[in-house]
């Protein structure tokens, strides 16, 4: 009896943890079609034109992923257009620093909505890079995967 209860409780904890995990992916190309449904037969809803843009997977069906972006736009993207890379978007303007402290040298001002590639995270800071800059940013008000 105890063994059955233990198995049920363990299964419940495992499945609830697995279901609550957020999955973030990034766009593989600089032009990605988002469709109304999970098939090439569905019309294109809109087109992303930002490589590495972080998106959140909210459902999947075969090779299709239902996604949501930081502006709450949603639709279906074929899995061949997605990749696993830690990218993030600041939800407000931020300062990029040379080291993970506000007392270090400011490197650049990062505008809201700019795609950043996450290199490393320590405490409340993430080391990120853009096309032009590399440095540390506080990880508050970031949308995407920050690990």
Which positions does each model-derived feature cover?
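A cross-kingdom feature marking solvent-exposed beta-strand/loop segments within repeated
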Residues: 38-40
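SH3-family beta-barrel domains
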Residues: 19-36, 46-51, 56-132, 139-147
């Amino acid at each position: 009896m105890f063994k059955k209860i233990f198995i049920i409780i363990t299964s419940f904890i495992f499945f609830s943890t697995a279901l609550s995990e957020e999955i973030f992916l990034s766009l593989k190309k600089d032009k990605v079609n988002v469709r109304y449904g999970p098939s090439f037969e569905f019309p294109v809803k809109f087109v992303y034109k930002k490589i590495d843009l972080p998106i959140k997977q909210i459902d999947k069906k075969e090779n299709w992923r239902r996604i949501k972006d930081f502006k709450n736009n949603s639709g279906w993207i074929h899995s061949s257009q997605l990749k696993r890379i830690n990218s993030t978007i600041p939800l407000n303007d931020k300062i990029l620093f040379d080291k993970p402290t506000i007392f270090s040298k400011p490197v650049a001002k990062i505008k809201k909505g700019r795609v950043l590639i996450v290199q490393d995270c320590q405490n409340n800071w993430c080391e990120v890079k853009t096309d032009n800059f590399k440095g540390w940013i506080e990880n508050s008000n970031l949308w995407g995967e920050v690990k």
